[in-house]
Amino acid sequence: MYVFIRANNPRPTFLVDMTTEERAAMQRHVAYWTEKAAQGIAIVFGPVADPKGVWGMGVYRVDDLAHMQRMLDADPARHILTYDAFEMPRGVLGPGEPGVHPFP
């Protein structure tokens, strides 16, 4: 199954005014999800340039929602970010991506 995650920053100005501790946690956060991408779990993730304030997004290939929650709980930035998770009942992947699930 696929899950869309919206990662909410603690404030709209977060990307430009992170504390030293927040920046270090976010560097570990990127490394953590980059490892998940190398494992084929994270399909795409990164910041979204919303004019109201930047937030993060990701699409993940997981066994179930509990699997996704375990990964979110282990995220090094868990104490900074909040998450909204949405199951994607179906998805179409581009050529070369394993597991294409076309709409009926």
Describe each PLM feature range.
Residues 1-104:
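Conserved, structured core segments of small domains
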